[in-house]
């Protein structure tokens, strides 16, 4: 890792699948580091699934030592039960990096798509294609990992504004 680089962890939260992606940013240059998907056991009780997600996220943070984290804000759907469960997973995804002392920024899905593709209503396939262009060495095996890399790229582009917003609080 370049000593001037900032390492960013992007996260796409979900209870069934949580995508993560790590990039290094030096000035305006982006470099792929790693990505993956955390798959909590679907049949396990909720507490065990959340604990699994937490443990795996801490492992990713310890392994790759990011300096900042960014999380995609969740979409609220018509099913209150699904929204609540997603909110619980999102809480764990926000907690893990904060627990490790990382500043955590949040970005709306529309902003992530606009930052990466240029259109807020872009399809997941378009996001994945642009991630391949922006990070040629990236190898996301799932849409969740690709989305997490897109969140990291968005944070790389907006981190100055995010830092100013945190300082204003």
Curated annotation (Swiss-Prot):
It is an enzyme of class 3 (hydrolase). GO terms for cellular component: cytoplasm; Holliday junction resolvase complex. GO terms for molecular function: crossover junction DNA endonuclease activity; DNA binding; magnesium ion binding. InterPro entries: RNaseH-like_sf (IPR012337), RNaseH_sf (IPR036397), X-over_junc_endoDNase_Mg_BS (IPR020563), X-over_junc_endoDNase_RuvC (IPR002176). It is found in: Cytoplasm. It comes from the Bacteria. Its main location: cytoplasm. Binds 2 Mg(2+) ion per subunit. Mg(2+) 2 binds at residue 72. Its EC number is 3.1.21.10. One of its GO terms (biological process) is DNA repair. It catalyses: Endonucleolytic cleavage at a junction such as a reciprocal single-stranded crossover between two homologous DNA duplexes (Holliday junction). Its cofactor is Mg(2+). The keyword Cell cycle does not apply. Belongs to the RuvC family. The RuvA-RuvB-RuvC complex processes Holliday junction (HJ) DNA during genetic recombination and DNA repair. Endonuclease that resolves HJ intermediates. Cleaves cruciform DNA by making single-stranded nicks across the HJ at symmetrical positions within the homologous arms, yielding a 5'-phosphate and a 3'-hydroxyl group; requires a central core of homology in the junction. The consensus cleavage sequence is 5'-(A/T)TT(C/G)-3'. Cleavage occurs on the 3'-side of the TT dinucleotide at the point of strand exchange. PANTHER family: CROSSOVER JUNCTION ENDODEOXYRIBONUCLEASE RUVC. This is Crossover junction endodeoxyribonuclease RuvC. It comes from Xanthobacter autotrophicus (strain ATCC BAA-1158 / Py2).
């Amino acid at each position: 890792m370049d000593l001037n680089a900032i390492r960013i962890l992007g996260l796409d939260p979900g209870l069934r699948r949580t995508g993560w992606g790590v990039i290094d940013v030096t000035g305006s240059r982006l470099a792929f580091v790693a990505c993956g998907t955390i798959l909590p056991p679907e049949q396990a009780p909720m507490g065990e699934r959340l604990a699994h997600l937490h443990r795996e996220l801490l492992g990713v943070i310890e392994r790759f030592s990011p300096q900042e984290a960014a999380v995609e804000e969740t979409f609220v759907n018509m099913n209150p039960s699904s929204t609540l469960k997603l909110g619980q997973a999102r809480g764990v995804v926000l907690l893990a990096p904060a627990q490790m002392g990382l500043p955590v920024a949040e970005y709306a899905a529309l902003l992530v798509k606009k930052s990466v593709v240029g259109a807020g209503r872009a399809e997941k396939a378009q996001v994945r294609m642009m991630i391949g262009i922006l990070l040629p060495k990236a190898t996301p095996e799932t849409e969740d990992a690709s989305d997490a890399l897109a969140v990291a790229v968005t944070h790389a582009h907006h981190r100055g504004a995010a830092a100013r917003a945190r300082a204003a609080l």
